[in-house]
């Protein structure tokens, strides 16, 4: 594939800047490059895969399950990502500074039992990473680092959703315009599945996650899940939280401090990519496994990197869940493409291996889909060392999983067009990204009715693949259709910003790309192909019962939908929506 004009321009700009450093002796630039840690010098697979600590969002009182209140802090500390890398300054979640980890503790909740979490900000006055005030509306008057926690995939009241403007600083000294309370309430009445929690402060999400503010959340429902006889227990059912980072020689996280349009945004870059692949807080770890089935709940917690996972020895993934919901039946596949924020729930049967080891590998270009090929460092994820002894395995791969009530387009109440725009400067470098031609802080334009379904036709007018995440609602992907005469359509949309007036039906009639089999279940985020219209059916009720929510979803501050490439989300590629009765 020919490189895009944008990439060519970016490469040329990088060359010019590099030459300027050499000619002018720009010590700051040269020193910055010299301080980068050469990751090729790190030996892979020397650290064991860590067990992430677990916090239970429930407890037993006289033999009965009861709600529990958790207090989880955000702390500044040092973290060892690799045996031979100096300790790294990070922000970490935990019940204390000593116990705080990257990723944060896995919260386990039980269906029907409320969990309450008081998130406490213990972070210092100044950030450990460069951040761009031209894109961040979350700027406190008296210093400190704004934070707010979003439970990704959670179905709960707006005041507990982690709205980007509901931020707070250390000790709740300052709060955002939509902050309401110190304690979040997770009602846990949705379908069982996998979620993750992470920071969501306006304009700071990318740097706060890069610093380490993320963790897993699992909702269990024993009467529904136990009959499936999937692998269980701490050894055989494990979250894998995966992200990419680069480092300086002193161990600190490297993030480019110069924007691609520095006269507009001094620091903002359209995507962050690191070369070390981190799993559960360790770079390229190893895990010794037995010859039996394991369950891995894999979260892509990267800022912008897509992963296309596969095993070096050809082992299959048996996909049982996608994002926060089970599939109707298991799907076997040789590879899995995971966008930032997506979760895939898989079984791997190591008894099928013909080799003693297997590398979990990656071959997704970055940016996806037409960026650079992977390198030696970012093409390796982790290593499995497979025990030679066979053993009895009582877990199974069931023929069926969980069948939810069907979703029919005929039941939808309306169709909405959601257009993704990217705007560039005179040097053809991105300056900002809008949805429907509007910034995040423009008034609400989408007002779905509680208990209904809507068809959203997502029109990607950019050259990037954008993972679209919808808070509260879940959806099914119906079809993906290429645009014909796309430049003509983009020109009209840029002028009129109206898909109907631009006669979308004339252009959305190109080749159709089938939805991958294991992504045909209920999703809360999906990859929107560039130059395509992706039709989804969004459900605004519980999918397991089709019942209305158990809370008032019409409250302020409402919900949002956005691109989950964090650098895009922070630079306006997010829109609010409000539920109505």
From Swiss-Prot:
Q: What is its EC number?
A: 1.-.-.-
GO biological process, alphabetically ordered: cellular response to phosphate starvation; meristem maintenance
Q: Which enzyme class?
A: oxidoreductase
Q: Where is Cu cation 4 bound in this sequence?
A: 466, 563, 568, 573
Residue positions annotated to bind Cu cation 2 are 152, 198, 564
Q: What does this protein do?
A: Multicopper oxidase that may be involved in copper homeostasis and oxidative stress response, and that is necessary for root growth inhibition by low phosphate conditions. Functions together with LPR1 and PDR2 in a common pathway that adjusts root meristem activity to phosphate availability.
What family does the database annotate?
Belongs to the multicopper oxidase family.
Q: What is this protein called?
A: Multicopper oxidase LPR2
> Organism source for this protein?
Arabidopsis thaliana
Instruction: Identify the coding gene.
Output: LPR2
């Amino acid at each position: 594939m020919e490189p895009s004009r944008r990439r060519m321009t970016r490469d040329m700009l990088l060359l010019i800047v590099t030459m300027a450093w050499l000619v002018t002796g720009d010590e700051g630039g040269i020193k910055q490059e010299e301080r980068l840690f050469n990751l090729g010098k790190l030996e892979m697979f020397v650290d064991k895969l860590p067990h992430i600590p677990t916090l239970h969002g429930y407890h037993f009182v006289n033999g009965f399950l009861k709600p529990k209140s958790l207090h989880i802090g955000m702390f500044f500390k040092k973290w060892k990502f690799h045996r031979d890398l100096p300790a790294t300054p990070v922000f970490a979640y935990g019940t204390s500074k000593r116990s705080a980890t990257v990723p944060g503790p896995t919260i386990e909740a039980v269906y029907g039992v409320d969990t309450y979490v008081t998130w406490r900000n213990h972070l210092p006055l100044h950030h450990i990473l460069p951040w761009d005030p031209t894109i961040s509306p979350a700027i406190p008057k008296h210093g400190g680092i704004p934070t707010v926690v979003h439970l990704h995939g959670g179905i709960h009241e707006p005041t507990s959703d982690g709205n980007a403007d509901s931020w707070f600083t250390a000790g709740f000294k300052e709060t955002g315009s939509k902050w309401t309370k110190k304690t979040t309430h997770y009602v846990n009445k949705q379908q069982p599945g996998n979620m993750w929690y992470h920071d969501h402060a306006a304009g700071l999400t990318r740097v706060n996650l890069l610093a380490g503010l993320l963790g897993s959340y699992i909702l269990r429902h024993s009467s529904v899940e136990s009959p499936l006889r999937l692998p269980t227990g701490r050894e055989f059912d494990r979250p894998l939280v995966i992200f990419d980072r680069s480092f300086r020689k002193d161990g600190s996280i490297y993030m480019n401090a110069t924007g691609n349009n520095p006269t507009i945004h001094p620091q903002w870059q359209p995507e962050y990519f690191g070369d070390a692949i981190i799993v559960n807080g360790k770079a390229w770890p190893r895990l010794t496994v037995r010859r039996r089935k394991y369950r891995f709940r894999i979260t892509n917690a990267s800022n912008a990197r897509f992963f296309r996972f596969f095993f070096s020895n050809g082992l299959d993934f048996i996909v049982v869940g996608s994002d926060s919901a089970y599939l109707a039946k298991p799907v076997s596949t040789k590879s899995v493409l995971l966008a930032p924020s997506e979760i895939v729930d898989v079984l791997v049967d190591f008894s099928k291996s013909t080799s003693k080891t297997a590398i979990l590998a990656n071959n997704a270009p970055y940016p996806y889909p037409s960026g650079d090929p992977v390198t030696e460092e970012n093409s390796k994820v982790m290593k499995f060392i497979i025990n030679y002894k066979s053993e009895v395995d009582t877990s199974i791969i069931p023929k069926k999983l969980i069948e939810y009530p069907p979703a029919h387009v005929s039941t939808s109440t309306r169709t909405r067009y959601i257009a993704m725009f990217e705007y560039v400067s005179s040097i053809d470098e991105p300056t900002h990204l809008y949805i429907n031609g509007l910034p995040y802080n423009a008034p609400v334009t989408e007002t779905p009715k509680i208990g209904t379904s809507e068809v959203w036709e997502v029109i990607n007018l950019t050259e990037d693949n954008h993972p679209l995440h919808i808070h509260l609602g879940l959806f099914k992907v119906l079809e993906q259709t290429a645009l014909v005469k796309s430049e003509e359509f983009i020109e009209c949309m840029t002028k009129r910003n109206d898909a109907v007036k631009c006669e979308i039906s004339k252009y959305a009639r190109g080749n159709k790309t089938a939805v991958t089999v294991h992504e045909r279940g209920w999703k809360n985020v999906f990859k929107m192909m560039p130059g395509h219209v992706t039709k989804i059916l969004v459900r605004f009720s519980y999918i397991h019962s089709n019942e209305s929510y158990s809370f008032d979803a019409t409250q302020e501050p409402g919900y949002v939908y956005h691109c989950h490439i964090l650098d895009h989300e922070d630079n306006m590629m997010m829109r609010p929506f409000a539920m109505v009765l």
